[in-house]
């Protein structure tokens, strides 16, 4: 089943509307301070649209999470979770974002802001991760000159990520700014995927046996594809459950 709800609206991509994370919160994955979608739930129904699947014994990823991926719990459900603080803008090494997402079961927060040059490499997310870009101070974090992948990641929460791929990545015209080929229970919220040279964000199972299901992409921007054929997104999931694409802005794609 597929749920596609496209509501095009003005979305301020500046970091001025990002939510602060109070220092007193011991676990930012449990209380990531979001209230973007006002809901009145009754058996999965909301005031903002039709019923989405809700597992009765599961808390949503964060307040305002909707759709098939809303029950992803990131690192929250892991008994051996740890909080990793990104302390520099390096592409690799201790304190870098790449090092932060190299291991499963992590809540990733930031005490640095600026541009991270991925050096034409893929940033790969792992199982049971909660990556909270809105915790960065100042103007936040921007990823550049590379791409992200959530392939084979299960129980993933990514919020407020800004990915700018660019034409120069490997000299190729078939690079997506982000996406996944297989995996389940993933949610992306208030992200922007731009300057892709194939699609900006793709969920392409392509008959992979592991499947791609229980995914939500919400409140995000997919735009400014860099090639004549570049598109906003490609969605081809497996037969299990589905994908929710909700309240996103697709703009300036071919």
Model-derived segments and spans:
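Right-handed parallel beta-helix
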Residues: 128-133, 154-165, 182-198, 210-235, ...
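Hydrophobic alpha-helical signal peptides and transmembrane signal-/tail-anchor segments
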Residues: 1-7
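Primarily auto-inhibitory N-terminal propeptides
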Residues: 49-63, 71
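Bacterial Sec-dependent N-terminal signal peptides
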Residues: 7-48
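Structural detector of coil-to-beta-strand junctions
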Residues: 147, 174-177, 200, 229-234
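Acidic Gly/Asp/Thr-rich repetitive segments characteristic of extracellular carbohydrate-active
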Residues: 40, 62-108
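Extracellular beta-strand-rich solenoid/capping regions of secreted or surface-exposed proteins
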Residues: 98-104, 115-132, 139-160, 165-183
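Binding-interface segments
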Residues: 206
């Amino acid at each position: 089943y597929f749920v596609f709800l496209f509501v095009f609206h003005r979305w301020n991509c500046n970091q001025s509307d990002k939510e602060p994370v109070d220092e007193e919160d011991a676990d930012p994955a449990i209380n990531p301070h979001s209230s973007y979608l006002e809901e009145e739930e009754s058996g999965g129904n909301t005031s903002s649209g039709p019923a989405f699947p809700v597992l009765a014994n599961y808390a949503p990823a964060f307040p305002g999470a909707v759709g098939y991926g809303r029950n992803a719990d990131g690192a929250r459900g892991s008994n051996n979770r740890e909080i990793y603080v990104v302390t520099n803008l390096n592409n690799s090494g201790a304190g870098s974002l790449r090092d932060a997402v190299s291991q499963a079961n992590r809540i990733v927060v930031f005490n640095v802001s600026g541009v991270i040059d991925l050096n034409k490499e893929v940033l790969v997310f792992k199982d049971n991760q909660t990556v909270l870009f809105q915790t960065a101070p100042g103007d936040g974090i921007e990823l550049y000159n590379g791409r992200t992948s959530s392939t084979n990641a299960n129980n993933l929460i990514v919020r407020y990520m800004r990915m700018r791929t660019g034409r120069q990545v490997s000299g190729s015209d078939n690079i997506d700014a982000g996406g996944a080929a297989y995996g389940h229970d993933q949610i992306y919220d208030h992200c922007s995927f731009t300057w892709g040279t194939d699609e900006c964000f793709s969920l392409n199972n392509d008959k992979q046996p592991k499947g791609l299901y229980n995914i939500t992409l919400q409140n995000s921007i997919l735009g400014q594809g860099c090639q004549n054929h570049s598109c906003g997104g490609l969605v081809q999931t497996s037969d299990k459950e589905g994908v929710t694409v909700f309240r996103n802005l697709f703009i300036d794609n071919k």
